[in-house]
Amino acid sequence: MRQSFDETQTPNENFDWFSQWYPVMPVCELDKRVPHAKKILGIDVVVWWDRNESAWKVFDDTCPHRLAPLSQGRIDQWGRLQCVYHGWCFNGSGHCKFIPQAPPDGPPVHTFKKACVGVYPSTVQNEIVWFWPSTDPKYTDIVKKKKPPFIPELDDPSSTNSFMNRDFPYGYEVLVENLMDPAHVPYAHYGIMQLDQPPKAKVDREGGKPLEVSVKKLDTNGFVGRQEWGNVKFTAPCTFCMYNDPVDVQGNGSASFTRTDKTICGQNFREQPSTVFFFFCIPVSPGNSRLIWGFNKNVESWIEKIILQWLFHMKLNLLVDSDLYLLHIEERKIMEVGAANWQKACFVPTRLDALVVGFRRWLNKYAGCQFNWGGKFNGTDLPPTQPKEQVQVPCSKLQKLHFCIQGSHCT
């Protein structure tokens, strides 16, 4: 069955992976008292709260002295980031403010350029810390020219945002296409996620059925899609949202409901309770990715928020565990045939494959077929295949599994 795509004609426009904003972590999962280590795009960064500027900072996770990780350091009594190895201290601009070993009557070596730490532009939007992956000073004010994709519903004060994040032993491309694939749900997640409306003519135990799925307005910035139960929007490279109502495609990667009844901070929202599911897919390194995901929902009381969040936490982790090993192996098979040959190697004849095909078409047409690691890695060099029992670690044993409600912190 032929799948149609409404593509914007931009034949000479290529997607620049390193000229984009990338999500780091939800604010509610960050402790202001300590620095935090993260790897994004193969870059080791440290995230910390600069109380002097009242802002989250993202630095290169390397002390210029002996290359020790600053994420293992501490925030000193003056609010500076201190390297725990030799005590060097840095302010929010990356300037070294104190070297304990330097004599006070000697040359001010702490002011030398080589004593500075690389600083990445960062901002907070939709209660998430974002960073721009370049320490070049020319990007210091990049947020004034280009902002991260904005989801207005996440700034609606009458609703609750619930966040989770988790690292996965498979890459960015497989992570994105799996989220876009509704056809696998009754099979890969059988017994965990039930269909709301079972098919009238049930052909198997799981209850799979044909569905109308389509992709529209595919260009270098991503695409929007339509499913029977609602709409989706992929804003390259990281943001994938599911909406109950038609998507209003706006500038700067924004998307919101088209049927609206109230206005908050210049943005429109429906009066009736509604839900937006959001997913931020983050390349970590070849064969590894991170997902920040959650939902926005109108709830009445704090106890409803806690219960809803806990149920969401438990159910979603069962879901992602159930196809974890399958995707770990699938990625290696894709690499064997080559990412550029995905369309030839995979037989995707039904409309239910439209979003996955749309994502792969976007990759092939605009983004070099797969994530570009900027020379840091060869994208085809994946880590060794792990045994199933190592990949599918029970939720109770996970160290990097977090969830939170906007304005609170839980693990």
Language model features with spans:
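C-terminal catalytic domain of Rieske-type non-heme iron oxygenases
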Residues: 9, 52-55, 137-411
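Rieske [2Fe-2S] iron-sulfur-binding domain
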Residues: 9-15, 24-153, 411
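Polybasic, low-complexity association/targeting segments
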Residues: 19-21
